[in-house]
Amino acid sequence: MKRRQKRKHLENEESQETAEKGGGMSKSQEDALQPGSTRVAKGWSQGVGEVTSTSEYCSCVSSSRKLIHSGIQRIHRDSPQPQSPLAQVQERGETPPRSQHVSLSSYSSYKTCVSSLCVNKEERGMKIYYMQVQMNKGVAVSWETEETLESLEKQPRMEEVTLSEVVRVGTPPSDVSTRNLLSDSEPSGEEKEHEERTESDSLPGSPTVEDTPRAKTPDWLVTMENGFRCMACCRVFTTMEALQEHVQFGIREGFSCHVFHLTMAQLTGNMESESTQDEQEEENGNEKEEEEKPEAKEEEGQPTEEDLGLRRSWSQCPGCVFHSPKDRNS
């Protein structure tokens, strides 16, 4: 009986020890697992924080990009967008031209602008420079003179007149050659053949030749007393209208003074502008001098500090006594 009791007691103790050991192990495992779990939780929380921060950054960047994009779209909507010439043509319902025509459109527009500027310059009026002279046996003997500022000697007086009519020379001289201009003024081949036939038909002894009037003598061979001499070619014309016609359509005669009068007008205009600028500068300089004069007078009237110091030193000198005129008389 005693042995059985001892065995039960020992079994109970062993079971308690094993239970205690198992409980210790479970506690140690729980203790070991608790910091790991906290670490895992901490790591997971850190991961969640990083994810949230990155999501916030991406959302901020995307929102800023959206704001910038929306602002650019508003600017484009507010500002009028220039349309290309092809789009304008398509809106009008016309067929767009070929690429060659589009490439040449800029050059043609530039050329038209230049030609219009030339025409507008000439439409303002052209100046003709001439001299009134007196003739004697076809030679200019005397003319009006004037005194210039540069020299005391009298020089020929040059006058100018502006054409009331619009002067249209045509295309610029760079585009048209003199041969084409001369060929336009010369008679054509058919006219020459017609003239040759009429000359061959008429005999030298026939009465038709005798009845025909003689060729008209040119104006520059007619003797005159007074006239208008062109400053370019020195030819004398009887009337101002003849001089104007000579300047405008002188190319028909093979020589034109048109360019001379244009350059002369340009040079005189430049000289006048320079003279006006010089006069304005002189007037401004005189005004500045007049303003500076009263200031200088005021400065001269006021005594300087050096003069006051000298006067005080002389008056305060003990060896020098200044007497009034009353003291001197006494």
Curated annotation (Swiss-Prot):
GO biological process, one term: fertilization
Tissue and organ expression note: Expressed strongly in testis and brain and weakly in prostate, spleen, pancreas and uterus.
Biased composition (Polar residues): 174-185
Compositional bias ranges of the Acidic residues kind: 275-293
Chief place where the protein resides: nucleus
Job of this protein: Acts as a nuclear transcription factor that positively regulates the expression of heat shock genes. Binds to heat shock promoter elements (HSE).
Protein name: Protein FAM170A
Originating species: Homo sapiens
Higher taxonomy: Eukaryota, Metazoa, Chordata, Craniata, Vertebrata
Gene coding for it: FAM170A
